[in-house]
Amino acid sequence: MRPQGPAASPQRLRGLLLLLLLQLPAPSSASEIPKGKQKAQLRQREVVDLYNGMCLQGPAGVPGRDGSPGANGIPGTPGIPGRDGFKGEKGECLRESFEESWTPNYKQCSWSSLNYGIDLGKIAECTFTKMRSNSALRVLFSGSLRLKCRNACCQRWYFTFNGAECSGPLPIEAIIYLDQGSPEMNSTINIHRTSSVEGLCEGIGAGLVDVAIWVGTCSDYPKGDASTGWNSVSRIIIEELPK
């Protein structure tokens, strides 16, 4: 009987080897052993040689624990360039005021002592170069103003641009009103006080602009005795501003 493979039990194999060894005859010369027995002995020796020293497989061991994490690998090679993206939508053009950097543009005209005592008409003028048509003009008149009368009166100081008052959005003006005198209040007191007329005007085209300060009457009130720029510096300041 031959073993059926390495899966045979150790006890069975040891028993087979012992049986073969017991059947071996005592040593003698080859000439005295019949050929049939010689073949049987040779076959037994082959079986002994085949299984002698064989390591038999034992039962499976307990699964081992997880190993430590390995070291980081070397960096990979750069990938191939990606494909071009889809074409974007058409953008919108920015307005001129954002595309170009804004350059300050201003001017000042001043007079040391106007001493202008007219009650109606132009007081002073300053010519300005406006660079853009979509900008606004900031104007300022600063100087002493006075109004005197015995009865109630009113005077108005206002700006004009190329001979017309501002219409974008409204006129730029300042008024002084003086009430009728009384025994307690002497309205003939002569007071000169530094005041200002200031505002923004839009809708004026680019180019030369004649900016002037005028004095006139108020609606529904008589004029009085007006004075502008007495004994002090008067000035007109003009500045172009982005809208």
UniProtKB/Swiss-Prot annotation:
Q: What clinical condition is it connected to? A: Barrett esophagus: A condition characterized by a metaplastic change in which normal esophageal squamous epithelium is replaced by a columnar and intestinal-type epithelium. Patients with Barrett esophagus have an increased risk of esophageal adenocarcinoma. The main cause of Barrett esophagus is gastroesophageal reflux. The retrograde movement of acid and bile salts from the stomach into the esophagus causes prolonged injury to the esophageal epithelium and induces chronic esophagitis, which in turn is believed to trigger the pathologic changes.
What is one cellular component GO term in this UniProt entry?
extracellular space
| PTM annotation | N-glycosylated.
Glycosites = N186
Q: Which gene encodes it?
A: CTHRC1
For whether the record's keyword set contains Glycoprotein, the answer is yes
- Would I find Glycoprotein among this entry's keywords? yes
Which stretches does the entry tag as region Disordered? 62-85
- What are its GO biological-process terms? cochlea morphogenesis; cyclooxygenase pathway; establishment of planar polarity involved in neural tube closure; inner ear receptor cell stereocilium organization; negative regulation of canonical Wnt signaling pathway; ossification involved in bone remodeling; osteoblast differentiation; osteoblast proliferation
Task: Tell me the ranges covered by the Collagen-like domain, including all copies.
Answer: 57-90
Where is the signal peptide, in residue numbers?
1-30
Q: Which GO molecular function annotations are given, in alphabetical order?
A: frizzled binding; prostaglandin-endoperoxide synthase activity; Wnt-protein binding
Q: What is this protein called?
A: Collagen triple helix repeat-containing protein 1
Keyword field: Collagen, Extracellular matrix, Glycoprotein, Secreted, Signal
